[in-house]
Amino acid sequence: MANYFNTLNLREQLDQLGRCRFMAREEFATEADYLKGKKVVIVGCGAQGLNQGLNMRDSGLDVSYALRQAAIDEQRQSFKNAKNNGFNVGSYEQLIPTADLVINLTPDKQHTSVVNAVMPLMKQGAALGYSHGFNIVEEGMQIRKDITVVMVAPKCPGTEVREEYKRGFGVPTLIAVHPENDPQGEGWEIAKAWAAATGGHRAGCLASSFVAEVKSDLMGEQTILCGMLQAGSIVCYEKMVADGIDPGYAGKLLQFGWETITEALKFGGITHMMDRLSNPAKIKAFELSEELKDLMRPLYNKHMDDIISGHFSSTMMADWANDDKDLFGWRAETAETAFENYPTTDVKIAEQEYFDNGILMIAMVRAGVELAFEAMTASGIIDESAYYESLHELPLIANTVARKRLYEMNVVISDTAEYGNYLFANVAVPLLREKFMPKVGTDVIGKGLGVVSNQVDNATLIEVNSIIRNHPVEYIGEELRGYMKDMKRIAVGD
């Protein structure tokens, strides 16, 4: 199979990368009705599989799980996930032939074998669904021409898909129809109904393409969403402990600080996050973030270039063929980091203290969001896609760190995201250790500025505020957040 994106000419590539339209709520007036009375069979019952299925069932759909016979016989975790939640479970041969919509929610590296196994069993005119287009775009999977191929891609880990649904909301979702596979012209109706059944329409859906979803998703998860949180946690913890900060306090400031800081980001963008700081702290965070952007821009651009060219995909697939040797090795190394093993503490940290004592963390968030957004848009991905894959999804990933540190983040994201995260962090950590962290102290990470006066130069503050507020990610963010008035606030801090 050939990389689908690389078979397109430049005009077609740019057209597919630029597909992204925010859909009006009126387009979801019938919600999930198009799929009611039809049989939905999900293949795979991991984080995305289980949680999407729970939402879809609660939305009135007929949902079953098809698993490999070995998973059923051995009662593996996927079988337990489905059975313990009251779902009908069967083998491919039992469930696939009667399914109207087969949704493949297995890990990326299993997609080719899974699709090759289920496609001969699918009835004429059925639909095949994905939540990530890697198999279509990067592996070039060819689907039988009578089958409609759609995508519904929630912009967060599977656990958060469920949590946001239970809060009465949802998560922003990209939907798409593969242009090579829409024989009956019903792809968009299927995708809209599926998205509504997960609750995505409440947060906002983007009519996109498989190509735009894959390229933007890979970039976001590798850099700001996961890679920067991992690198930042590791180097900031090391710095604080080396400079005499109590290890328990240092670890807690980071583990729960990312969530607290990015919760402000979710509701008011970088502007609001920076406004939570005093004026002197805001200027300091701005200066640090500008330095970080200069230092890390080449790394962000390299990741974007490798994603667009297909180099990242081929590298990761080579590791698949090597039994994930690199992935498992990097996972084990992460488990041994000092941050992952910090001693728990009962110390209370107030919400504002996370901002006051986490100035460097705020600088890292601003720098990372803007760098990822800039790299994506410079490559032809439009602002809406770049916003969701850089800024909006960040609080959802930070929530996972708050639960069980980096372990939880890497468990709930896909193996593809985890692999890309390590590629980024493995370069970012030594880069920051050598070029940046020796120049900072506990005034920006651990203790705060400790200044008595908030007096600053007016001209400097005006210039800083103007630069922050006039970045393109802030313009598109304000527009898109206007569609998400129902976002639920989560409890942060102690």
Swiss-Prot record:
Residue ranges of domain KARI N-terminal Rossmann in the record: 14-208
Gene3D superfamilies assigned to the protein according to its UniProt record, in alphabetical order: N-(1-d-carboxylethyl)-l-norvaline Dehydrogenase, domain 2, NAD(P)-binding Rossmann-like Domain
Cofactor note: Binds 2 magnesium ions per subunit.
Residue positions of the active site: 132
One annotated Gene Ontology cellular component of this protein: cytosol
Residues annotated as binding substrate: 414
Catalytic activity, EC: 1.1.1.86
Binding locations of Mg(2+) 2: 217, 389, 393
Cofactor list: Mg(2+)
UniProt xrefs under HAMAP family: IlvC
Function noted in UniProt: Involved in the biosynthesis of branched-chain amino acids (BCAA). Catalyzes an alkyl-migration followed by a ketol-acid reduction of (S)-2-acetolactate (S2AL) to yield (R)-2,3-dihydroxy-isovalerate. In the isomerase reaction, S2AL is rearranged via a Mg-dependent methyl migration to produce 3-hydroxy-3-methyl-2-ketobutyrate (HMKB). In the reductase reaction, this 2-ketoacid undergoes a metal-dependent reduction by NADPH to yield (R)-2,3-dihydroxy-isovalerate.
Record-given protein name: Ketol-acid reductoisomerase (NADP(+))
Recorded name of the encoding gene: ilvC
